[in-house]
Amino acid sequence: MSIRILPQEEIQQAASSFHNPPLLYANPKNLYARRAKRLRQLAEHNPFGDYLEFVANIVEVQLDLLENQPIANRVGELTAYLEAHQGVKPLDVKTFKRSDEWQKLLLAFIDKFKPYASDTVLATLEWLEKASNSELEMLADHLLNECYEEVGADKAVFLWAVLSLYWVQLTQQLPRNTKAEYGEERHTCPVCNSAPIASVVHFGETQGLRYLHCSLCESEWNMVRAKCSNCEQTGKLDYWSLDSMDAAVKAESCGDCESYLKVMYQDKDPHVEPIADDLGTLFLDAEMEQKGLARSAINPFLFQVE
């Protein structure tokens, strides 16, 4: 999938199909507030509760920076780029030129997160604080290109939190007279080309529709429920849960590509949230791994480093 700007004559036609939009941008303030609340709720009765509380602290710092240290306005630049490059992923992690604002956000994040940090975490924060600009850019490149072993899980969590905060603000500056174009690579985000965290089956205006939730820019894009979100095959899909088939979080597995992705059902629990509920169902991941299935998603708080 990719994005193109609609000419004026197509805007009215597109408006008639907004009940089934192929692409949804996040509301960052609402998203971070909901995520932090859900993490703390799940932490109360979860064996990994301490880690969920740790992640909730990260999310609340993201919200603080969103409200008090927003990035510069690049609307004109982004609109001009889309007009000149129709049918692209406008914030593609492999080609988009980051400004140094993300590094400024990182330093602000470190300063605000230190009161929550243990000695071990504090050592990581201080390393990042002292790193040169070129070192940080290299680490960001490795991280965004999925070379996690070049970064380390301890640093990756904080770097991704800040890069995601930077990217989600960029999505707010993209022109809204755009349309997601179906094409190749539907398993990655049409905005930034990152992998999903999970898929969410919506209720409300988009009742019953499945959207993949981006791990970086927090956008969601529609994919039909009858096919694998990774390889798009349809013949060997199975659904797994820890408790019952009415569970709000299940794993969708594909026998063709031997991968799985979690599916979250808002009609079963309206409070499900991709990152929080993914972290809250780690035992489901363990079950899938025992079946020899590979996770096709990225959770920025669970980087797998070989």
From Swiss-Prot:
Q: Which Pfam families match?
A: FdhE_C, FdhE_central, FdhE_N
Q: Which InterPro entries match?
A: FdhE-like_sf, FdhE_C, FdhE_central, FdhE_N, Formate_DH_accessory
Question: Superkingdom of this entry's organism?
Answer: Bacteria
Q: Which GO terms describe its molecular function?
A: ferric iron binding
**Biological processes annotated in GO:** protein maturation
What Gene Ontology terms describe where this protein resides (cellular component)?
cytosol
Family from the record: Belongs to the FdhE family.
Q: What is this protein called?
A: Protein FdhE homolog
Source organism: Glaesserella parasuis serovar 5 (strain SH0165)
Q: What is the lineage of its organism?
A: Bacteria, Pseudomonadati, Pseudomonadota, Gammaproteobacteria, Pasteurellales
Q: Which gene encodes it?
A: fdhE
